[in-house]
Swiss-Prot record:
Gene that this polypeptide is encoded by: hemA1
Other facts noted in the record for this chain: During catalysis, the active site Cys acts as a nucleophile attacking the alpha-carbonyl group of tRNA-bound glutamate with the formation of a thioester intermediate between enzyme and glutamate, and the concomitant release of tRNA(Glu). The thioester intermediate is finally reduced by direct hydride transfer from NADPH, to form the product GSA.
InterPro entries for this protein: 4pyrrol_synth_GluRdtase, 4pyrrol_synth_GluRdtase_N, GluRdtase_CS, GluRdtase_N_sf, NAD(P)-bd_dom_sf, Shikm_DH/Glu-tRNA_Rdtase
GO terms, molecular function: glutamyl-tRNA reductase activity; NADP binding
Protein name in UniProt: Glutamyl-tRNA reductase 1
EC number(s) recorded for this UniProt protein: 1.2.1.70
Catalytic activity annotation: (S)-4-amino-5-oxopentanoate + tRNA(Glu) + NADP(+) = L-glutamyl-tRNA(Glu) + NADPH + H(+)
EC category: oxidoreductase
UniProt note: domains: Possesses an unusual extended V-shaped dimeric structure with each monomer consisting of three distinct domains arranged along a curved 'spinal' alpha-helix. The N-terminal catalytic domain specifically recognizes the glutamate moiety of the substrate. The second domain is the NADPH-binding domain, and the third C-terminal domain is responsible for dimerization.
Residues the UniProt record annotates as site (Important for activity): H83
Record's subunit section: Homodimer.
HAMAP family (UniProt xref): Glu_tRNA_reductase
Membrane-spanning ranges: none
Binding locations of NADP(+): G172, A173, G174, A175, V176, G177
Amino acid sequence: MLVDKLYALSLSHKRLSVDELSEISRNVHKTCYNVQAFVFHTCNRVEVYLYDADAGPAEHIKRSYGPYVEKVAEFRGVEAARHLFRVAAGLESMLIGETDVLGQLEEAYESQVRRGNLRGLLKTVVERAVAVGKRVRTETGISRGPRGLGSLSIVYLSRRLPLREISVCVIGAGAVGRGVVKELIDAGVRRVAVVNRTVEKAADLGVEVRPLTSENVEWCLREFDVVYTAVSSFEPVVVYVPPGSRVKLVVDLGVPRNTAPNLPVEVVTLDHLRELAEEFNRQRAEEVSKAEKIVEEEVARLEEVLRRRWVELEMSALLKKWFAVAEEEGERAGGGPARLAAMSTVKRTLLPLVNYIKEVAVKDLAVAEGLLQVLKSAYA
């Protein structure tokens, strides 16, 4: 089975603290930078997914988890797919059903496709995971209440400070930061501002926006009661607090942590939110079984999806060549209508053949492999 070639490594909030996860994230990213792999790193997990990888590279990546390598969970085949689908569905999150993880998954997918690290059938697996996450949140009520760790932190904040009387600055306007800003506004916070690397990306939020500089980080600390950090950075964003600053609380949602140790102000991290998350997890217990049923349905379908995609990938080079030949012959015959007719003939002849081989692959992968080999030998 094609899904059998999938392999995953995972360390999450279930085995390590946020600070410990932050320790290993840089090394894992560095190890995987030029590798065909999908790295999914949030404040609650550091995971790597590989497809059809040799044992040597896989073991090398596993060792990049450093002092925590013995705590790494390994998943293979269907279990690896099931784990990724559960992560996308929010079933493995500290706050069950949270939506931030889905946005982060999409961001990781897009960036790694652009970089060229994610392609082939591994890309298809991640695409299916995103689709599963969306389906779970559409068909169940698992995300009712706080929709993410950002919104959970606002509940925490509301139990500490009067929201309508405070000012909040959010550093970072990615998926998590944007969600926090919108919920702060909805909660009636007196003043909200954003500091972000690109001002344009946060312009639509309808609040004051400044570029991410050390001066503007200081401005946040001096002028606001609460500062959120939600930046993807391997270096701390808040390294010191200027004397006389107004800030009472820093909420660090960064990946990894955005705050330097031993700051002279209270820093709230995700570890502080565990008890509150459990409170809402108990309320969502009934929806968990519905979400798990959807995950199992999608896991059962994955092999068929992979086989169809495998045929497309195997045939793509041949199709490209055949279309090029048809275009060339059409130009020789006078171009224009002749070229279009030649291209149309290729489509009418070959696309049904591709679809036929897809159906064969679903039933018998070995037979489909034989058909593809015949085509490659005859026409390559």
